[in-house]
Each structure stands twice: as C-alpha cells, then as structure tokens.
Amino acid sequence: MVNGTKGVCVSGKPWKTEKKAYNRSGLADAQRTPYEKRMEQKRKLDEIKEREKELKREKEEQRAAHAEKIRTRRQAKADRERMELLQAKLHQKVIDRRRRREKRNKMLKER
C-alpha cells in the first residue's frame, strides 16, 4: 500500500488481494474480542444448534408416528374388509348346505 491508503497494492496490481494477519495479535484493538466473550458466543450458538436439532428430531418423530397411525388404520380396514368377504362366502356355503338338506327332506317326504 502506498502512503497508507487502503485498497491499492504497492505493485499497482489491482487483482492482488489485501493481506491480513493470521493471528489475532495483528488485529486492531477494536476488532479483538476477549476469549471469554468468544467462548460465550460459541456456547450460545451451540445451544441454539442443539435446540434446533432437538426440534427437528421431535418433528420427525411426530411425522413418523402419524404415518404409522395411518398405516395401522389402513391395515385394520383391509383386514375388516377381508373378514367381511370371508364371512359372506362362508354364510353362502351354509345357505347352500341348508337348501340341499331341504331338497333331500322334501324328496324323502314325497316318497
């Protein structure tokens, strides 16, 4: 930088980026934050992330429970329909058997 002006490189090449200090001691006092304050911010951020994870997990559990409830309801409905069909078929067999018996009895009476 020439004459302390920012944004212009000594070489005059505008595509060169401005170099910054790697460690915190090179920063200005106004930019430095104490270690405790940084750790407090990091702790708060970690708490927020943990809470978000917990909320997501709870939401996923609720969604899974709802899906399972729907699945069991559909399964119960299918079982009910299947049993009704089976009962109707068995009832028809009983009716047919009674008719055959009545025919036999009628034929025996006519003799």
From Swiss-Prot:
Organism, as annotated: Schizosaccharomyces pombe (strain 972 / ATCC 24843)
Keywords associated with the record: Coiled coil, Nucleus, Ribosome biogenesis, rRNA processing
Basic and acidic residues compositional bias, start-end: 34-80
Family listed: Belongs to the CGR1 family.
Region (Disordered): 21-80
Record GO biological process: rRNA processing
Coiled coil: 35-93
Main function: Involved in nucleolar integrity and required for processing of the pre-rRNA for the 60S ribosome subunit.
One matching Pfam family: Cgr1
The protein's name in its UniProt record: rRNA-processing protein cgr1
GO cellular-component term (any): nucleolus
Location in the cell: Nucleus, Nucleolus
Lineage: Eukaryota, Fungi, Dikarya, Ascomycota, Taphrinomycotina
